[in-house]
């Protein structure tokens, strides 16, 4: 269903509340990766260029104790945003009260204000993450319009997304949210064929909904990562010391029955005696020997997966093929990334931290059609679920 976009709103002279996703890694006040801040710039820039006042809300990490507040303040984020926008950004170290209200009332058209981490409200009874109705209503009262550009939290029903939206006459998606809905939505609902899904990661349980939703839609589903060996166990193969979810073996059997020859499992694996980069390792076909654990897909599988990708028109990749953070077990993930970067005339979509990190490490990120900013949110979207943060945005 088509949603209102920020460019559909008349923002001139308006106080525009924008829920952004500034949940960036920060250590000792230094931002490790500002991608999420950069991703929010088009929406913020649009509002201020069109004479609106941009009031930004975001969470940062999980705030469980008073001590967390010092580490999880949005102050460094506001400073970085100021550098990126090349203009002053007001930071207010409060999530409610007179200081915040006064600062908002002093804003001129084109000004930008960042208020403190919305999850500071979780210290007193999870008001933000529990979508406290009073908090949502209060935040909504601070603005005239609401724009949700935080796809990363769209699968959560929080006061700062659903709470504000339900107290506003008009809400819209930001440009980042629009892009996520377009690419992920097209992949799920209207993909160009051949449509290939590449799913990795440790657990079948994390990806089960995605696999079930994509089996009828995809032409091939390539499985890698630790979850491979739950499928191996379901086939009656030996898995050695490899990761296995025993309670998911029956489910894996059911999926294999449903998917038939659409499901491609690794035919060889890189195995080691210990979960360590320094452990002796080798490549084995099929069964995993006793005393060994599988930590990456092998060279024959890499070739099979690359062959399967040839001619693909839509590819969704979520999850690593092996223990990507250890160099000896990173090859599968890197080779799949290279193959994706080499595809011509295909819509390529990457989600998940490790897959995204691989794309950046390889320098193929510019060749990828869309890199999703939402981990859990993109997975739930691929599962075909309705995301509360998107459902709360006004329809066109």
Swiss-Prot record:
ATP binds at residues 207, 325, 352-355. GO terms for biological process: gluconeogenesis; glycolytic process. Its EC number is 2.7.2.3. One of its GO terms (cellular component) is cytosol. Signal peptide: none annotated. GO terms for molecular function: ADP binding; ATP binding; phosphoglycerate kinase activity. Its main location: cytoplasm. It catalyses: (2R)-3-phosphoglycerate + ATP = (2R)-3-phospho-glyceroyl phosphate + ADP. Pfam families: PGK (PF00162). Keywords: ATP-binding, Cytoplasm, Glycolysis, Kinase, Nucleotide-binding, Transferase. It comes from the Bacteria. InterPro entries: Phosphoglycerate_kinase, Phosphoglycerate_kinase_CS, Phosphoglycerate_kinase_N, Phosphoglycerate_kinase_sf. It is found in: Cytoplasm. Belongs to the phosphoglycerate kinase family. PANTHER family: PHOSPHOGLYCERATE KINASE, PHOSPHOGLYCERATE KINASE 1, CHLOROPLASTIC-RELATED. HAMAP family: Phosphoglyc_kinase (MF_00145). Monomer. This is Phosphoglycerate kinase.
């Amino acid at each position: 269903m088509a949603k209102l976009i920020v460019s559909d709103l008349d923002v001139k002279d308006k106080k525009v509340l924008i829920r952004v996703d500034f949940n960036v890694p920060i250590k000792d006040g230094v931002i490790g990766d500002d991608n999420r801040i950069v991703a929010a710039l088009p929406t913020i820039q649009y509002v201020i260029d069109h004479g609106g006042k941009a009031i930004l809300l975001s969470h940062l990490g999980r705030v469980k104790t008073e001590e967390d507040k010092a580490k999880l303040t949005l102050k460094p984020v506001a400073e970085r945003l100021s550098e990126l926008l090349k203009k002053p950004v007001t930071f207010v170290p409060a999530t409610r009260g007179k200081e915040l209200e006064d600062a908002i009332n002093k804003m001129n058209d084109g000004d930008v204000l960042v208020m403190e981490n919305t999850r500071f409200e979780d210290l007193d009874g999870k008001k933000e993450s529990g979508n406290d109705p009073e908090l949502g209503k209060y935040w909504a009262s601070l603005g005239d319009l609401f724009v949700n550009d935080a796809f990363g939290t769209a699968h959560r029903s929080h006061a700062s997304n659903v709470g504000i939206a339900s107290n506003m006459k008009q809400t819209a998606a930001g440009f980042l949210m629009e892009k996520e809905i377009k690419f992920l939505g097209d992949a799920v609902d209207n993909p160009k064929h051949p449509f290939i899904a590449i799913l990795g990661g440790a657990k079948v349980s994390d990806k089960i909904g995605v696999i079930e939703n994509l089996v009828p839609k995809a032409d091939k589903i390539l499985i890698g990562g630790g979850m491979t060996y739950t499928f191996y166990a379901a086939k009656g193969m030996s898995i050695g010391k490899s990761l296995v979810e025993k309670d998911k073996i029956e489910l894996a059997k059911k999926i294999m029955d449903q998917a038939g020859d659409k499901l491609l499992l690794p035919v060889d694996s890189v195995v080691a005696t210990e979960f360590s980069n320094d452990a002796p390792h080798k490549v084995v076909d099929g069964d995993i020997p006793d005393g060994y654990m599988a930590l990456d897909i092998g060279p024959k599988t890499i070739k099979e997966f690359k062959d399967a990708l040839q001619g693909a028109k839509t590819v969704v990749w979520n999850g690593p093929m092996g223990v990507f953070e250890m160099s000896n077990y990173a090859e599968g993930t890197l080779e799949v990334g290279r193959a994706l970067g080499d595809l011509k005339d295909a819509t390529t979509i990457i989600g998940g931290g490790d897959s995204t990190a691989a794309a950046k490490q390889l320098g193929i990120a510019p060749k990828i059609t869309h890199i999703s900013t939402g981990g859990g949110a993109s997975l739930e979207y691929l599962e075909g679920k309705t995301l509360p943060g998107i459902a709360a945005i006004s329809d066109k």
